[in-house]
Amino acid sequence: MRRRKKRNNTIWWLVGILGLLTVLCLLALWTAAGMATSRVGEAVKPLVSIQRDGYILRKYPAHTVAATVVEGERYTRAMFRGFEVLNRYISGNNDQKKRIPMTAPVLQGMREKGGGFEIAFILPDDLEGSGGAPQPGDKRVWIDRRPPMFMAVRPFSGYATSEYAAEQIAILKDLLERDGIQTARPPAVAQFDPPW
């Protein structure tokens, strides 16, 4: 009888310890997820910003991106896959094994030729002064220096599903047509938070 009682106490003690460890692990994951999904620090700042009826015209300075193409996937899945590939690049999968700070926004647009989606991370400005961006360790990633450009921007909040993004893009296209503004590139969605 004593042996059985002692065994039951030991089992309850182990269950209590496992429960406490589970709670601590969940708390750690919750904290980490909060940090990982919070807005990232550096973002490309527009040089000029003109508010219009329903959108904003902005001129952005030249900037460098790490980009990849995801083919054969739908909009949301393409963002996840592209984000994973680019996240490995900034996490050290490059010739310098260098970790690169995450910046905002993450860009996703349809390619003009060849189909698929181009996903791009804007790289921090300080890489320019330190010899440029490290070369990717994955052949699916390339580095591209983009010239200064004007962009028509329609800010929206919420999760950028393919349907919601398409709706916002259609509204922006109508507004630009109304104002006689022609576009030079296919539209892109710029997200300031991770895609999960």
Q: Which ranges hold each PLM region?
A:
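A solvent-exposed interaction/effector surface
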Residues: 2-196
